[in-house]
Amino acid sequence: MKEYSAYLVLKPITDAQIRQIKSISENYNLNIDIGESHLEFEYAGRDSSRFVVKFLRDIAPIVGKAFGEVVCEIINDDRDNDFEFYQIRDGKLLFQTGKIVRGQERIID
């Protein structure tokens, strides 16, 4: 299962761009909250067709640059979850993978 969490701060976009992004989100059945300077959404479930990533890729040229990132937590059965991080910069979607590295357990007195 994947859990996406997005809060992006946008440089101000026009009403036409907002409508265009809403239309793209509807094509992917993704519920978003968008205004002239923000984009926010959460999604949890299967994403085998990577529709959330495709949505982000499709809106990147419209947005141009966004501050913040989209975090995707990939929940594994072994509780050693993986992470994917997405950013929009220069009209392109950038991607990084990540893992949480745990230190040794300690007793708190």
Question: What kind of feature is each model-predicted range?
Answer:
Residues 1-27:
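Short, extreme N-terminal segment that most often corresponds to the first beta-strand
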Residues 23-109:
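Charged interaction segments
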